[in-house]
Amino acid sequence: MAKKVALAYSGGLDTSVCIPILKEKYGYDEVVTISVDVGQPEEEIKRADAKAEKISNKHYTIDAKEEFVKDYVFPLIKANGSYEGYVMGTSIARPLIAKKVVEAARKEGAVALAHGCTGKGNDQLRFEAVFRQTDMDVIAPMREMNLTREWEIDYAKEHGIPVEVTKSKPWSVDENIWSRSIEGGRLEDPSFVPPEEIFEWTTSPEKAPEQPRVVDIGFEAGVPVSLDGEKMSGYAFVKKMNEIAGENGVGRTDMIEDRVLGLKARENYEHPAATVLRQPNSRPLRNSSLTRSELKFKKIVDDQWSELAYYGLVDEPLYADLNAFIDKSQERVTGIVKVRLYKGALTILARSSPNALYSEDLVSFDSQTIDQKGSEGFAKYHGFQARMYRKVMDKQ
């Protein structure tokens, strides 16, 4: 029986050179490649399919776009997911991709699982958190052979594998419907100004339209459901919002990120929809619909949720526990937020919710609904301990 290995395949340089390496260096008879569509460009999927058909023994392309948005992106929106300001598009996609690879591997009777991640990044951990739940061997050629990008380019050319990157522009790009990351090459130098050519989703703010774009975003139970009154599926909504926000220059991040291993890395991201959808949900509707105690506690929950998601630990029991609280807290986060997008800036213009705890009548300076004299007793004891402390210190 042929000795099979299942490879998580993106069509990029790293995973493409893994195919001959797994045969030549690791002795596998067949390499089954699995590409998972989580919103990459259609041409990228086609390019990966065409390449895999030529150099692998069997290839799968699995459409997981709607599943990705429904089961991974929407929970992130409800959790206000963010790691050091990063919207975690790559982070939340990896566990889903890994699970689809495992499913295909079992179908094929593979004895091993492989990925093309390096030993310096986070993705090796995210993939293997899922892979190592199986009894199959786990192989990481990039890490185990300590490969460099230049070596891979030469090796690919020797084996007739088409190479999109070059030694002078070795950008590594990872893309799904939620975000696009660009790293590597000269971008690793924090003092290097990224060339405009690395950006594809977002217009330079200087070249964005002169007229602002105003949109109404409808939310139900914490997730977006409509754009300017039009109901949309999750994937269609995020895709459309990427287009609108991106053409108005919204959604670029250039940051120094703390990786799981402790290394600091320079990362460039594009995430137009993520920038827009997290803001309206996290501020206007939540702040008007949840109590102060809920909001305070939810910040703690959101931070812990984000860390687990960034680490790829979505099968950790605590992750499910946190989601239970988040889902319950978001039941009342329903309403419409009006947003203005203009030359890279996002501004919340207005919000309305049937569940708002805000009362214009109660808070108005002109309202007599609340007798202001009633707060006098509260004011007398507000800061009481600080006053007592001051008296004690003044006596010393």
UniProtKB/Swiss-Prot annotation:
Catalytic activity, EC: 6.3.4.5
GO molecular function: argininosuccinate synthase activity; ATP binding
Binding-site residues, L-aspartate: T118, N122, D123
Coiled coil segments of this chain: none
Listed GO CC annotations: cytoplasm
SUPFAM superfamilies: Adenine nucleotide alpha hydrolases-like, Argininosuccinate synthetase, C-terminal domain
Subcellular location: Cytoplasm
Pathway assignment: Amino-acid biosynthesis; L-arginine biosynthesis; L-arginine from L-ornithine and carbamoyl phosphate: step 2/3
Record's catalysed reaction(s): L-citrulline + L-aspartate + ATP = 2-(N(omega)-L-arginino)succinate + AMP + diphosphate + H(+)
Binding site for ATP: A8, Y9, S10, G11, G12, L13, D14, T15, S16, G116
Record-listed L-citrulline binding positions: Y86, S91, N122, R126, S172, S181, E257, Y269
Gene Ontology biological process terms from the UniProt entry: argininosuccinate metabolic process; L-arginine biosynthetic process; urea cycle
Record-stated family: Belongs to the argininosuccinate synthase family. Type 1 subfamily.
Cross-referenced HAMAP family: Arg_succ_synth_type1
UniProt subunit comment: Homotetramer.
Name of this chain's protein: Argininosuccinate synthase
Record organism: Methanosarcina barkeri
